UniProtKB/Swiss-Prot annotation:
EC category: transferase
Superkingdom of this protein's organism: Bacteria
Listed name of the protein: Uncharacterized N-acetyltransferase p20
EC annotation from Swiss-Prot or TrEMBL: 2.3.1.-
Source organism per UniProt: Bacillus licheniformis
Classification via Pfam families: Acetyltransf_3 (PF13302)
Keyword Transferase tagged: yes
Length: 178
């Protein structure tokens, strides 16, 4: 997995040394509100998550980058592909930031770079995002990056013990301006 760079950010493979700071973010109910995890209570949960995703990355099934601010070398969140379907050239995108980093354009900058990586390096044809209807910030982000809302998937998946509706968004390689 290569390291990616934007004007303000470095996106690199998640490492076990990121567990302490990621545990802080992933233990915040506001950060995990729309993630399919319950808030973490122990750093070992973050270590396990990092190891699981890195194992999936080795198999080409998923990947996740730590998002780092170049100026401060601070890990502020993660982004990546939760599921990669190489046979069909598609992947599901995911992203999260610590609450104190919201509203600064970091998610947009990181996800834009991730999209470029997906279409160029991973040779994807389609990038998908599943978003809960109440997750307005994520919907705004996807709209700003030219994702198309395809529709509502009713009772589509379990999150925190209950079936939820999700919007399906997608961006196709031929639509991507790059």
């Amino acid at each position: 997995m290569e390291t990616l760079y934007t004007e303000r950010l470095t996106l690199r493979k998640m490492e076990l040394e990121d567990a302490d700071v990621l545990c802080q973010y992933w233990s915040d109910p506001e950060v995990t509100k729309y993630m399919n995890i319950t808030p973490f209570t122990d750093v070992s949960q973050a270590r396990d998550m990092i190891q699981m995703i890195n194992d999936l990355s080795l198999e080409g099934q998923a990947n996740r980058f730590s998002i780092i601010v170049k100026e401060t070398d601070e890990v502020i969140g993660t982004c990546g592909f939760n599921m990669i379907d190489q046979e069909n050239g598609r992947a599901e995108i995911g992203y999260d930031l610590g609450r104190n980093h919201w509203g600064k354009g970091f998610a947009s900058e990181a996800v834009q770079k991730l999209i470029d990586y997906g279409f160029t390096s991973l040779n994807l044809n389609r990038i998908e995002a599943k978003v809960e209807p109440e997750n307005t910030p994520s919907i705004k982000l996807l709209n700003s990056l030219s994702f198309q809302k395809e529709g509502l998937l009713r009772d589509y998946e379990k999150a925190k013990g209950r079936l939820i509706d999700v919007y399906m968004f997608s961006l196709l390689k031929r639509e991507y301006a790059g």
